[in-house]
Structure formats: C-alpha cells, structure tokens
Amino acid sequence: MKHLTKIAFLALLLASTSCASRKKTVAPVQPQPFEWLTANMDIQAEGNGMNFDDLSGQLRMRKDSLVWLSVTATLGVEVLRAKVSTDSVWIVNRIEKTYLAEPMKNISETLGIPLSLALLQTLLLDNNEGLPPVENQTVQLKSFVWGNLSAKIKYHNIKLDEKTAFPLKITDKMERYHLKKKGY
C-alpha cells in the first residue's frame, strides 16, 4: 500500500506539471533614465581597411552633455582617448601620436554625416530611434554598421547613476595635453 500511495502521488505531481503550457510575457524594454553612465566595454571595430579585434574600453557618459571614452589594447596600453561634448570633439590617438580638437560642426562637414552628441549617445546606448538615414546603415543590439564603420560593443559592469558625477581628472589631463601641444 505504501508503494501505491507513493506512485499515485508522483503520478499526480507529474500530471499537474507536465501538460501545462505557459506563455511568458516579456515586458517591452524601456530606456533607463540616468544622469551619468559608466561602463566597461569589449570592442571589435573595422573600417577604412583596418580591423581591431581585441580592444577594451571604458565609457563614461553624462546624458545630453558629455561622452568620455578610453580604449585600450592588449596589456592595458591606451590606444585612444576621446571626449565629445555638445559642441566639440577632442581625440588623442596614442598609436599615431596625434590629436584632434575640433568643433562638432567641422567634423560633421568633413565626414559628410549629421554628427552630433545626441547621435553618438543614441548609437552607444543602442537606441536606434531617430537615427538619420545613411547609406548601408544598420543598427542592432550592441553592434552597428554606419557608413563604412562597423563596430561590435559588449558592455559589462554598467553603472547608472542619477546623482553622483564621476571625477573629470582624466578629461582635464586631455585638455591640458591639448593646451600644451598648442603652446598655450
């Protein structure tokens, strides 16, 4: 009798769980509000005949105000540092030992694309709504092809902060570097 009770219990348990079909409801993903965003990234990029497979980076962003990016290669060697504000772009290329400090308008005209801080933040945050049309443009989750530039970005250690700002010491160094090179 003991075995019959156990078998009946197991059969009842199996019958109650095996035939149930459940539809999982997935809520639509909404953009998270933030004031500051900090993220580490693994980057694969190619464009203009160059291919970079093993890059990592650190992204710091203030909504509608600033994008700061530091890209490092293997062994932690910094390859590129960039700061993009609403009206200017500063880029230090450590490999070629060059830098760029230009108004956003000049870079937009040179590239022939409507470049802006809002567009850059849209691409980095994987929010493809409102992107201006460009030939061969595709934007997908954590990767994009825009014109002749393509990149795959894998974010990890993302931190959204609504109040606290990150220290701008590294960006200040970049500006001091720019002023030193200009001879000011």
Please identify what each model-predicted range represents.
Residues 1-8:
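Bacterial N-terminal signal peptides that target proteins for export
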Residues 41-45, 69-72, 141-146:
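Short beta-strand segments that buttress and anchor functional surface loops
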Residues 15-18:
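C-terminal motif of bacterial Sec signal peptides marking the signal peptidase cleavage site
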Residues 131-184:
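Non-transmembrane domains of secretory- and envelope-associated proteins
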Residues 20-23:
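Bacterial signal peptide processing site
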Residues 55-60, 153-155:
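Hydrophobic/aromatic beta-strand elements that line small-molecule binding cavities or substrate pockets
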Residues 31-48:
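A short, Trp-centered hydrophobic/proline-enriched beta-strand micro-motif
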Residues 67-117:
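An acidic-aromatic
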